[in-house]
């Protein structure tokens, strides 16, 4: 879809009031009006408790329907409320992407005793003990669900490792011992082998496990009528399984079923290798672009803005790039904290929303606010969304000649007249002369991002002098 926009419709610190699905339903019309075409919803199944953001996934088959872990609803609401929210979004032609947490399971119902080997947390290929008995939280029986939808039960033979020995009360990384059992291959090589992330780590070499997860995938797509998945923590999951999972889903639901993977590593080579390994079955979040923007926001005028797209997916493999500014993991106080500083947030959104390439993803925290505090950025994001919808079409020409002042020109096409965005990290006001085309001679262009600049008249050479204030952005469009 041309000029589509995704929104991550949650942040880490949402209230545990069970009303999030209701809020989403009520917001559907507004999301459509601002140009949102896809909504990434949080993990919608039962976690370790009602407070779980969703990444401590306990029972994928419980979408807020069964009394488990002390609650029927999830943090976000009930299954019925979720279904109603999705139906409302679909009325406005907005796709829904469910966050799929397939790497691990949390909140086991019972412990089991089994042989394990402790490994070095800094290199999981190095064993630091002989095999010994531990008591691990690996037995999942889902008593509250009572076999509805799936009778599958989980035990230690279906996992690769845990991080806690209940017998000794000791934390560590324990690799489960069994026939042909080892860490999954086809994962990131960080820490030797980055199969293990948290909780009870699922063994994707086990055929029964693969079939159960694929069965769940097909079921949840049909049950909720979702249009895609956001695949969590893919660098910890066997890449062959990831390709198989998405292929099998599409065999049932069609090639248009969407997927974007979270591979959190600022290494373009690794991300390109991953795309190749999974046969380009999924898009990826552009982590490299996020970190470039993070560095730019920290280093202010010392950052060379001409390098903002260096080592990014959107530059190297644009059809697979989901561009984003921040998310629940990068927001302040989170595990992978790297939040873009406030002054640069408008720059960052201008770079992703006015660009030709990439599928841009808004962050709930940037748009609505974090922890109940209203975001100061909503007005500028709204303005950029308006320009994306009404002006940002055609080819993209980057004017990256000055380390502190850069410009992006969308040339326009058909009835859409294009736009110019000028971005500055300089500590002084600037002006940049750009050629927008001789056919635009005499046109009047206005600045719409709140600078208060006088209009620009395009001269007989098709050029205009576009201004920008210190450390600000200016967005110019043809005046009607």
What are these regions (language model features)?
Residues 74-108:
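Substrate-binding cleft of carbohydrate-active enzyme catalytic domains
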Residues 1-18, 196-205:
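Boundary/entry segment of secreted carbohydrate-active catalytic domains
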Residues 5, 11-19, 23-25, 39, ...:
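Active-site-adjacent substrate/metal-binding segments within catalytic domains
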Residues 178-218, 223, 234:
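Active-site-adjacent "subsite" loops/lids of carbohydrate-active enzymes
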Residues 2-5, 23-33, 43-45, 49-64, ...:
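Active-site-proximal helices and loops of the catalytic beta/alpha 8
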Residues 118-193:
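Core domains of carbohydrate- and sulfate-ester-processing enzymes
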Residues 15-22, 76, 80, 207, ...:
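Soluble non-cytosolic domains of exported or imported proteins
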